[in-house]
Regions:
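Alpha-helical support elements that line or immediately flank enzyme active sites
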Residues: 36-48, 94-110, 114-117
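Catalytic cores of secreted or luminal carbohydrate-active enzymes
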Residues: 147-197
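Extended glycan-interaction surfaces of carbohydrate-active proteins
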Residues: 2-89, 122-145, 163, 169, ...
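Composition- and surface-driven signal marking solvent-exposed, interaction-prone regions
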Residues: 54-55, 107-116, 129-132, 177-180
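Alpha-helical packing segments of well-folded alpha/beta enzyme cores
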Residues: 1-3, 93, 113, 160
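Aromatic- and histidine-enriched alpha-helix N-cap/loop-to-helix transition segments
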Residues: 31-35, 85-96, 102, 152-159
């Protein structure tokens, strides 16, 4: 059997609509709703049907706080929005989930994550994305709750915005053929126009102008 078949059999939790966090010492699934399941979309090992259901779970109120996807669902016994790994929100984790969603064509979730990241940046000093922040539910008129000892700046947090944007654009590069590919690009509502200048692919380079329309994104080279 293929790796995907064995993975699906071992990790899929039908009643939870998500992949198990791990297998214990007796190979029993740890039936916990976590953001880690989004990484299965990032790697491409998830089946199309299960990817769609995982996306719905990740975007539900259990896991999506309004600012981002929590590491642990608020319905879980160990949930603590101020815990380092049991309910906090990590920008790099969300960016990987966004790329995974884009891989399966689930762009509404990508836009939701990208918008959350952008709005997080608006309420923080220097508009920097931190290593992590607390997973309390978002409330109207209130900012997020910071994680007191989160590194800021931090490299993988800083790179998360670009990774999430890449997911929105469906952007990939085939260096051997000097190609830039956009797969069903979208731009979130807060971006009407975007310029990418001097994008280098091998020995070539290109300038791009992207404009958001009601139903699609126009690209001018």
């Amino acid at each position: 059997r293929s790796l995907r078949e064995r993975f699906e059999e071992a990790f899929w939790c039908e009643d939870l609509s998500i992949y198990a966090l791990a297998l214990d010492g007796q190979k029993r699934p740890c039936r916990v709703k976590t953001s880690n399941a989004g990484h299965c979309l990032y790697t491409g090992i998830a089946s199309d049907e299960h990817a769609r259901r995982v996306a719905e779970t990740l975007m539900s109120d259990e896991l999506f706080s309004g600012w981002g996807v929590r590491t642990l669902a608020d319905s879980e016994r160990r949930y603590n929005p101020m815990s380092y790994h049991n309910g906090s929100i990590w920008p790099h984790d969300n960016a990987m989930i966004a790329v995974g969603l884009a891989r399966y064509g689930l762009k509404s979730g990508v836009e939701k994550i990208m918008t959350g990241m952008f709005e997080v940046s608006l309420v923080l000093d220097f508009h920097r994305l931190p290593e992590l922040f607390c997973g309390f539910v978002r409330r109207p008129g209130q900012g997020l709750t910071r994680y007191p000892v989160a590194c800021n700046p931090q490299a993988w947090a800083a790179g998360s915005a670009f990774m999430a944007l890449q997911a929105c654009l469906g952007l990939s590069i085939i260096a051997s053929e000097q190609k830039v590919v956009f797969n069903y690009p979208i731009l979130p509502e807060f971006i009407d126009k975007m310029q990418i200048k001097n994008l280098k692919v091998g020995t070539a380079s290109v300038d791009l102008l992207l404009r958001r329309h009601d139903l699609d994104v126009g690209i001018t080279v």
